């Protein structure tokens, strides 16, 4: 029970049945079907408030990529969050969810001409520019629109964030940002482009960071650049230090709090007059979400035991591509014996699994499992692979339930291909 509270304080067993915010997960599965994503509203609110308390003067821009459900983005926007976006679709969504453009920052190495045009036209707070060529293209677009685009340059501090290599973004070999040693040249170049207004510096070193010491190394370099640019007369209004705080996936993981990060950086930032921007995503949304899946079949092949469920890599791809661990527990616990099994989905690939060689309480066909820490990069990375409709999503708060995404059907998948 105590372990569950470390994942989400609103998660508990009552008489052997799993509840979240007073709502039975079994009843949710029976009402809405499976696979089903379930989110805890109070958890999301508390995580956002933890950032606001730790960084009271900062702009907290939620990383929309983590989970783009409009209801969840709207919830955060109403709390005062801005949006960290990386695509035209995320710009559209953030505005649709009520987040004003003056609280939107736009990163990403491959912004298209249309995406840049729409964002300039929307007059967003800041473009986090990733290359000199992007500076040129953005300047040209802003000129055609008769506007000035506010920019920061994303600098790459060459810091190892000690995370999975696929989500380490602050090392020299990664595709992101400009070499921090070359940054002053890029700022001087940008200052000569008449349709750009330099307002900030941006840095983001990676995701799922549990050891926060690399943040200090990165921010030291960024603050040094800030001081140098300020001395040269640049008016740096915003220091965007990105996101990336990790969450508890494995039972033994120790999750850093926003206050831990604030304490680590306090002395570095105390003389910085620029407004700080942070871009949390996973650390707000990750443990707010659970994926419920139903056991379809049990299968033994010699000494190998398989639990085959209806959620696959199309619903939650993190285990397949990152070899990521998600804690999985029965929705109904009956103090049965433990078995060691591969928990696998229905997709026609050997790489379709939620867990391998996992010790878990013995379950039967038709029962439900809860996959924890599924609120970030879960539905957001889902697909229609094997022609499977994507899951429904519900939001729970203090015993109430709201359907926030309908389950897709086959017509939804094929309709864009018909009558062409």
Curated annotation (Swiss-Prot):
EC number: 4.1.1.20
Signal sequence coordinates: none
SUPFAM superfamilies per the UniProt record, alphabetical: Alanine racemase C-terminal domain-like, PLP-binding barrel
GO BP annotation list: lysine biosynthetic process via diaminopimelate
InterPro entries per UniProt: Ala_racemase/Decarboxylase_C (IPR009006), DAP_deCOOHase_LysA (IPR002986), De-COase2_C (IPR022643), De-COase2_CS (IPR022657), De-COase2_N (IPR022644), De-COase2_pyr-phos_BS (IPR022653), Orn/DAP/Arg_de-COase (IPR000183), PLP-binding_barrel (IPR029066)
MF-aspect GO terms: diaminopimelate decarboxylase activity; pyridoxal phosphate binding
Sequence positions that bind substrate: 282, 318, 322, 349, 377
Keyword Cell wall biogenesis/degradation among record annotations: no
HAMAP family cross-referenced by the UniProt entry: LysA
Subunit text: Homodimer.
Family: Belongs to the Orn/Lys/Arg decarboxylase class-II family. LysA subfamily.
Cited function: Specifically catalyzes the decarboxylation of meso-diaminopimelate (meso-DAP) to L-lysine.
Name by which UniProt lists this protein: Diaminopimelate decarboxylase
Organism from which the protein derives: Aquifex aeolicus (strain VF5)
Organism lineage: Bacteria, Pseudomonadati, Aquificota, Aquificia, Aquificales
């Amino acid at each position: 029970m105590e372990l569950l509270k470390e994942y989400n304080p609103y998660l508990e067993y009552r008489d052997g049945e799993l509840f979240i915010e007073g709502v039975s997960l079994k009843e949710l599965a029976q009402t809405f079907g499976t696979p089903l994503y379930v989110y805890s509203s109070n958890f999301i609110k508390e995580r956002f408030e933890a950032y606001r308390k730790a960084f009271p003067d900062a702009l907290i821009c939620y990383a929309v990529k983590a989970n783009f459900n409009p209801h969840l983005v709207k919830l955060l926007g109403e709390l005062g969050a801005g949006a960290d976006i990386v695509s035209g679709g995320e710009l559209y969504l953030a505005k649709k969810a009520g987040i004003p453009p003056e609280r939107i920052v736009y990163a990403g190495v491959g912004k298209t001409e249309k995406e840049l045009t729409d964002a300039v036209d929307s007059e967003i707070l800041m473009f986090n520019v990733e290359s000199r060529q992007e500076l040129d293209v953005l300047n040209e677009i802003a000129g055609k629109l008769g506007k000035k685009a506010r920019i920061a340059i994303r600098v790459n501090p060459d810091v190892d964030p000690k995370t999975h290599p696929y989500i380490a973004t602050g090392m020299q070999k990664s595709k992101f940002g400009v070499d921090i040693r070359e940054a002053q040249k890029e700022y001087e170049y940008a200052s000569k482009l008449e349709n750009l207004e330099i307002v900030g510096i941006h840095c983001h070193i990676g995701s799922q960071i549990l050891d926060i010491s690399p943040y200090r190394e990165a921010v030291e370099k960024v603050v040094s650049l800030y001081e140098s640019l300020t001395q040269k007369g640049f008016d740096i209004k915003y220091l965007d230090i990105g996101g990336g705080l990790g969450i508890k996936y494995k039972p033994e993981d120790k999750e850093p709090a926003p206050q831990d990060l604030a304490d680590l950086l306090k002395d570095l930032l105390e003389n910085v007059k620029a407004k700080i921007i942070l871009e949390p995503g996973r650390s707000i949304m990750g443990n707010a979400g659970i994926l419920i899946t139903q056991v379809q079949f049990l299968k033994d092949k010699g000494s190998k035991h398989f639990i085959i469920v209806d959620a696959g890599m199309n619903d939650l791809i993190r285990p397949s591509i990152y070899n990521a661990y998600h804690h999985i527990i029965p929705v109904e616990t009956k103090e049965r014996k433990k078995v060691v099994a591969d928990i696998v989905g229905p997709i026609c690939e050997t790489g379709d699994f939620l867990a391998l060689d996992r010790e878990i309480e013995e379950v039967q066909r038709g029962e439900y499992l809860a996959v924890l820490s599924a609120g970030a990069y879960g539905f957001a990375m889902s697909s229609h692979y094997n022609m499977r409709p994507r899951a429904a999503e519900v939001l729970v708060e203090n015993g109430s339930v709201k359907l926030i995404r309908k389950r897709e059907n086959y017509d939804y998948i094929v309709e864009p291909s018909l009558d062409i």
